[in-house]
From Swiss-Prot:
GO terms for cellular component: cytosol; endoplasmic reticulum membrane; Golgi membrane; plasma membrane. It catalyses: GTP + H2O = GDP + phosphate + H(+). The keyword Chaperone does not apply. A motif (Effector region) lies at residues 34-42. This is GTP-binding protein Rheb homolog. Residues 180-182 form a propeptide. SUPFAM superfamilies: P-loop containing nucleoside triphosphate hydrolases (SSF52540). The lineage of its organism: Eukaryota, Metazoa, Ecdysozoa, Arthropoda, Hexapoda. It is an enzyme of class 3 (hydrolase). InterPro entries: P-loop_NTPase, Small_GTP-bd, Small_GTPase, Small_GTPase_Ras-type. It comes from the Eukaryota. The keyword Protein biosynthesis does not apply.
C-alpha cells in the first residue's frame, strides 16, 4: 500500500504539554524546560494496521478562551489532538472552547479528535477527574486518553487512535482489534 500523509494539529491551553507530547512521540525524549511555542512542525512515519503514514504534527501556540481560532488549522488537517493538563481545570475548560470553535470554523458536526488528559505523573495534583475527561470525549464522539509525556505513558496511542479515526472518517474503516485503551 502506498504511504499516506496525514496532518494533525496539537491544540490546547499553554503549558499543558503539547510540545512535550510531540517531542516524546517523534524523538523519544522528554524535554523538561518550558519554552513557549509559536509553532513547530514534527514529522514521523507511523505504521497502523499494515498501513504506513507520514504523520505531520503541527504543534500550535497555546490557546486560551479569548483566542480567535486560527483559520489555517481548519484547512488541510485530517485530525486534531486536544490536550489539557489533569492538574488544571482551566485547561480543561479552554479545550471545550477550542473544540466548539473548531467545529464552528469548519462548519461540521464532527471532526476526528483525540482528547488527551496529560501529566498523569502529577496525579497527586489532579483537579480534573478521569470521568470528566471520558464524559467530554463521549459527548464529542472522540477518543480519550490520559498520558504522561514525561514517562512516555500512552503517548504513541494518541496518534495510533487518531489515525484510525481519520481513516474511519475517510470511509476506510480499520478492522477492530477488540482492545480498548483508556
Amino acid at each position: 500500500m502506498p504511504t499516506k500523509e496525514r496532518h494533525i494539529a496539537m491544540m490546547g491551553y499553554r503549558s499543558v504539554g503539547k510540545s512535550s507530547l510531540c517531542i516524546q512521540f517523534v524523538e523519544g525524549q522528554f524535554v523538561d524546560s518550558y519554552d513557549p511555542t509559536i509553532e513547530n512542525t514534527f514529522t514521523k512515519i507511523e505504521r497502523v494496521k499494515s498501513q504506513d503514514y507520514i504523520v505531520k504534527l503541527i504543534d500550535t501556540a497555546g490557546q486560551d478562551e479569548y483566542s480567535i481560532f486560527p483559520v489555517q488549522y481548519s484547512m488541510d488537517y485530517h485530525g486534531y489532538v486536544l490536550v489539557y493538563s489533569i492538574t488544571s481545570q482551566k485547561s480543561f475548560e479552554v479545550v471545550k472552547i477550542i473544540y466548539e470553535k473548531l467545529l464552528d470554523v469548519m462548519g461540521k458536526k464532527y471532526v476526528p479528535v483525540v482528547l488527551v488528559g496529560n501529566k498523569i505523573d502529577l496525579h497527586q495534583e489532579r483537579t480534573v477527574s478521569t470521568e470528566e475527561g471520558k464524559k467530554l470525549a463521549e459527548s464529542w464522539r472522540a477518543a480519550f486518553l490520559e498520558t504522561s509525556a514525561k514517562q512516555n505513558e500512552s503517548v504513541g496511542d494518541i496518534f495510533h487512535q487518531l489515525l484510525i479515526l481519520i481513516e474511519n472518517e475517510n470511509g476506510n474503516p480499520q478492522e477492530k482489534s477488540g482492545c480498548l485503551v483508556s
